[in-house]
């Protein structure tokens, strides 16, 4: 034998290898929303989500403003149930002379980037700054953007994961309203 430890060769202690889990990962139940902190921030890449979700993509094909409004409405419900701050970022960089603009629609902060600035660049800076004092989640379907925000300490949500979370919140909200009536 080339290498033998000082106390003899390594022995098999009868431990079984860990079981492989399937593709589904367990998620926390949304019945108990206590794991959400008030200083949580969700940053959403607006157009990326619109064109990743079939129902919003269909609306956007006819009317982009209506698709943006539908996303804001969905995020408003999500924010109300989760109690977190939501920042929705849209690209506005191709518009000549466009200053950065922000507005609050139904509690959701909506940001249009300034001329020459992409939503990705804005989200990277925002996640870095907010990450110093908040728990930040960034929702985007852009894999490169997900890697960048992970580097800043933010959590990432794919478009599919955000949709799943929003459906869970919607179901929780419907159940809550049903109990009240």
List each language-model region with its residue ranges.
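Nuclease catalytic cores that cleave nucleic-acid phosphodiester bonds
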Residues: 1-2, 11, 17-23, 29-44, ...
